[in-house]
Design a protein with these regions (language model features):
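Canonical Rossmann dinucleotide-binding motif of NAD(H)/NADP(H)-dependent dehydrogenases/reductases
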Residues: 3-35
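Catalytic Tyr-X3-Lys loop
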Residues: 81, 98-117, 132, 136, ...
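Active-site helix of classical SDR
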Residues: 120, 156, 164
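Alpha-helical segment proximal to the catalytic Tyr-Lys
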Residues: 125, 169-170, 245
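Active-site loop immediately N-terminal to the catalytic Tyr-X3-Lys motif
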Residues: 145-151, 173-174, 224, 242
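Short, small/polar-rich loop/turn modules that mediate ligand/substrate recognition or access, typified
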Residues: 172, 177, 247-249
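C-terminal helical subdomain
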Residues: 180, 203-243, 247, 256
Length: 264
């Protein structure tokens, strides 16, 4: 299927692996020029090498919690038609009142929410002026199904979704369509780190830690496995395309059936 975006330029944040890299690969296959950014410079270079896109993929190492870095990213990226914001952290875990500090809350706020505000502020106004744009944020299953030990992540991702809804309503008349995807337990550097840490703490293999997590913490994930980054990227690529020209403010769940509730 031709998504109708060949020749466009997409900025992908959090591009050093996982969903960011998978999205880059999907869009590259549609003839899109890429600007890839991440705080992890080595990981970003490795992603670019695996993509093998040559001059069709530029890389910019940037910390999106730093306004000056976002301004530099804007200068180096040039004209951008598509923004995909996957960057973020899981944040501290534990009792939201007794275990989580003010700094923990602020770290998640800046990494998961304000980073998105900053890149949108930098790149969406020119899209509005041009009369065309696509913006896709990554939220989480936690928005619909908060977990009691992930309060900072729950709150930050819920804030992202409300940002998406507000931006979608305001900018759609100008041709800029804003949507989001809500993954569950996806294969990524982030979940790899979580599972490796759990495995070390419990004295088991990473594979056993994943199996235990699915059985004990995510029994409602009906497919019983981690999702693949490519499965999320396929939905993101659709939302970036001309094929999604009547989709505004939607939050697509790519969660293996983890969330069973109905959106009204």
């Amino acid at each position: 299927m031709d998504l109708g975006i060949s020749g466009r330029t997409a900025l992908i944040t959090g591009a050093a692996g996982g969903m960011g890299e998978a999205t880059a690969r999907a869009l590259l296959g549609e003839g899109v020029r890429l600007v890839l950014t991440d705080l992890d410079g080595d990981g970003l270079a490795e992603t670019a090498g695996r993509l093998g896109a040559g001059d069709r993929a530029a890389t910019v190492v940037a910390d999106l919690t730093e306004p000056d870095d976002v301004e530099r990213l804007k200068r180096e990226a040039g004209e951008v038609h598509v923004l995909v914001h996957t960057a973020g952290i899981t944040g501290a875990k534990g009792d939201p009142l007794t275990d989580i500090t003010d700094d923990d809350w602020l770290d998640a706020w800046h990494s998961d929410f304000m980073s998105g505000v900053r890149v949108a502020r930098a790149f969406v106004p020119p899209m509005r002026e041009a009369g065309w744009g696509r913006v896709v944020f990554v939220t989480s299953e936690n928005v619909a199904q908060p977990y009691d030990d992930e309060a900072v992540y729950n709150a930050a991702k819920a804030a992202v979704l409300t940002l998406v809804k507000g931006m979608a309503q305001r900018y759609a008349p100008d041709g800029v369509l804003v949507n989001s995807v809500a993954p569950a337990f996806i294969e990524s550097p982030m979940t790899d780190y979580m599972m490796e840490k759990t495995a070390e703490e419990e004295g088991v293999s990473k594979e056993q830690a994943i199996e235990d997590f699915l059985e004990e913490d995510r029994p409602h994930l009906v497919l019983g496995r981690r999702g693949k980054p490519e499965e999320v990227a396929a939905v993101i690529a659709f939302l970036c395309s001309e094929r999604a020209s009547f989709v505004v403010g939607s939050n697509y769940r790519v969660d293996g059936g983890s969330v069973a509730s109905i959106d009204l």
